[in-house]
Amino acid sequence: MKIAVLSRNPRLYSTRRLVEAGVERGHEMVVIDTLRAYMNIASHKPQIHYRGKPLEGFDAVIPRIGASVTFYGCAVLRQFEMMGVFPLNESVAIARSRDKLRSLQLLSRRGIGLPVTGFAHSPDDIPDLIDMVNGAPLVIKVLEGTQGIGVVLCETATAAESVIEAFMGLKQNIMVQEYIKEAGGADIRCFVVGDKVIAAMKRQAKPGEFRSNLHRGGSASLIKITPEERMTALRAAKVMGLSVAGVDILRSNHGPLVMEVNSSPGLEGIETTTGKNVAGIIIEHLEKNGGPNMTRTKGKG
């Protein structure tokens, strides 16, 4: 197969590993800088050009689209779909998962366990919003934040009111969530490929920190997940429409709670921690399911 990898940086661990795994399995792998691809949106012959030449003959595309380039990245991926190229994850599913509020609304509709979450626009509603999530301590999250940036733990209602007012004053969209104390600053990253959780790791926040992101100095270790956690991760990925996803789960007193469904999960942490060839499993999934004109979104967007 001829497989495109949409990535800003060919030297990133995840991009490198996907290329290596594809080449090992006999595929032609081409890394394309997402922001340098440009489109000809013609009625009968949609095209993507790159460095002055049309991109042709691709069977599949692996999107590694960073959060900051979601809009343009999804447009490029959608153009590949219009050309009949099979996407590992579809543009519509990636756009859906990048909107944290929309994601939680979709997951809640399907009865998937979530932390109690509130969202409001007016400062007048802040006291009621805090009560809605069972009061302080609580967590405030900027909707556009990634890697733990823009996430604040407020120990008291007074502190929470001040922080929420400040964010609202800056015209930032935020959501307020109950703090799951029993999770102890740890979460579980379940790596979903197709209809299987192929790997899982526990991420533990460093002392004095509650955010378990590895980018924030958290540590990763092997973990055995329960059947309920496995089912929750698979259902969450399916609701979002993602074939490959990193589903972040908290262990609470009332079962597993989904924090986030990541459409472009990093490979370094999960491969290093579990010793699994995750990149190879992803390429294998593409071989079984992909091929020209097999995209489900063609014509739907």
Swiss-Prot record:
This protein's source sits in the domain of life called Bacteria
List residues of the ATP-grasp domain: 104-287
Q: Which residues bind Mn(2+) 2?
A: 260, 262
- Keywords in alphabetical order: ATP-binding, Ligase, Magnesium, Manganese, Metal-binding, Nucleotide-binding, Protein biosynthesis
| GO terms of molecular function | ATP binding; metal ion binding; ribosomal S6-glutamic acid ligase activity
Q: Which residues bind Mg(2+) 2?
A: 260, 262
What cofactor does its activity depend on? Mg(2+); Mn(2+)
UniProt-annotated binding residues for Mn(2+) 1: 248, 260
- Please indicate if the UniProt record lists Ligase as a keyword: yes
Q: Which GO terms describe its biological process?
A: protein modification process; SOS response; translation
EC number of this enzyme: 6.3.2.-
Gene3D superfamilies in the cross-refs:
3.40.50.20, ATP-grasp fold, A domain (3.30.1490.20), ATP-grasp fold, B domain (3.30.470.20)
* Details of cofactor binding: Binds 2 magnesium or manganese ions per subunit.
- Binding of Mg(2+) 1: at which residues? 248, 260
Q: Which GO terms describe its cellular component?
A: cytoplasm
Which residues of this UniProt protein bind ATP?
A: 141, 178-179, 187, 211-213
What family does the Swiss-Prot or TrEMBL record give for this protein? Belongs to the RimK family.
Protein name according to UniProt: Probable alpha-L-glutamate ligase
Please name the source species: Pseudomonas fluorescens (strain SBW25)
